[in-house]
């Protein structure tokens, strides 16, 4: 069982905000989220859409740095918050999820590269 708090978001609600910081990864359990750079500005740009099974805030978590994107619920969305404290348990008990996490990271980095090029 993956430990962590579940959070629910309504369509249009901000899940994660650019430049904020939280040492946690969000596993999307239900719904979809849009990941944006410069959200709410004239330079706003959708980088990628995240669906159930995907992750949010991975790069910020691994680098212990503020977020470089904003995630917004595109429909009602539920996430599980995997904190630094329970990440080791997550890694040990969910080896298949770790491969999914790595695949997500790779796809996300590719999407961010396209957004900035």
Language-model segments: what does each one mean?
Residues 67, 87-117:
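A small-molecule sensor/coupling module
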Residues 62-85:
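Ligand-binding loop in jelly-roll beta-barrel domains
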Residues 25, 49, 81:
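Short aromatic/basic micro-patch
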Residues 40-56:
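Short acidic-glycine-tyrosine-enriched beta hairpin
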Residues 30, 52-55, 76, 84:
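ATP/adenylate-binding site constellation spanning eukaryotic-like Ser/Thr protein kinases
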């Amino acid at each position: 069982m993956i430990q962590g708090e579940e959070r629910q978001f309504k369509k249009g609600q901000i899940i994660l905000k650019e430049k904020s910081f939280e040492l946690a990864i969000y596993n999307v359990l239900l719904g979809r989220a849009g990941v944006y750079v410069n959200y709410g500005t004239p330079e706003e740009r959708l980088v990628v859409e995240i669906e159930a099974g995907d992750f949010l805030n991975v790069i910020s978590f691994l680098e212990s740095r503020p977020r470089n994107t904003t995630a917004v619920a595109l429909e009602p969305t539920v996430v599980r918050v995997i904190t630094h404290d329970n990440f080791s348990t997550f890694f040990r008990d969910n080896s298949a999820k770790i491969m999914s996490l790595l695949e997500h990271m790779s796809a996300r980095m590719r999407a961010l590269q396209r957004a900035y090029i």
